[in-house]
Amino acid sequence: MRNQLYLMADDIAQTARETFPGAQTHLIGGDSRERHDIIEDNSVDLSFTSPPYLNNYDYADRTRLETYFWGEAKSWSDITKKVRNKLIMSATTQAIRSGFDKDHAMSDELCSVAPCVAKMLQNKVSQLVALRMVKGGKKSYDLMVAGYFNDMLPVLREAYRVLKPGAAFVLIMGDSAPYGVHIPTDIYLGEIGVAIGFTRYEIEDLRVRGGKWKNNPQRHSVILKESILTLFKN
């Protein structure tokens, strides 16, 4: 997996050399939720990413072929320790119920920075807590939703720190509706971004999602979408 990452970095570097002679690329391995002092304040012209979609997709499991092949993992628990536990929360397979306070699911930091959003999210989590008790499978969507936004807050904060005034943070993402409870991910993250310090945000809808499941009787009826969220820093 590490070799593949370096191959991708080489491709980017080659493209940069051919398109922008003299340009340099630097690969920084790290967690986007953490501060990286190598990137100075107000030094970045553009930040562009697509964070995990809040759709219970186990991104860690998608590394199974590579981690097994390279001998970095031999079991589900190995992948959990080495990959799954390190990712931004986006799947119920990452959720740990022990110690979870369903009435205070949102982090203290999120409640302090964006109390209105935190209150709306707490309401969504409470709905999911109740639905979990009557639904088959008892999926931990409540933990998933709370964990996702708690994890994304420091990502937004760090992006704001490193971006230059006048720069933008662009995110491609999808909304979610676990157990039919709609989570407008782009709006919530946009509002959190403004609470952090971004001046404003714009949302551009790209496409409708989930159409292939429309004939599934167990599927919710919420129409989902993929969108571009752009946060502007002045």
Predicted region positions:
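SAM-dependent nucleic-acid methyltransferase catalytic core
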Residues: M1-F48, L54, D58-D61, M120-S126, ...
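Core SAM-dependent methyltransferase catalytic element
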Residues: K164, Q218-N234
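Conserved S-adenosyl-L-methionine
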Residues: T199-R209
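SAM-dependent methyltransferase catalytic-core segment centered on the flexible catalytic loop
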Residues: L54-R157
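A short glycine-rich, Lys/Arg-flanked "PGG" loop and its adjoining helix->strand segment in the class I
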Residues: L153-P165, G193
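Short alpha-helix
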Residues: V155, P184-G197
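C-terminal target-recognition/interaction regions appended to catalytic cores
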Residues: S176-H182, L189, Y201, S221
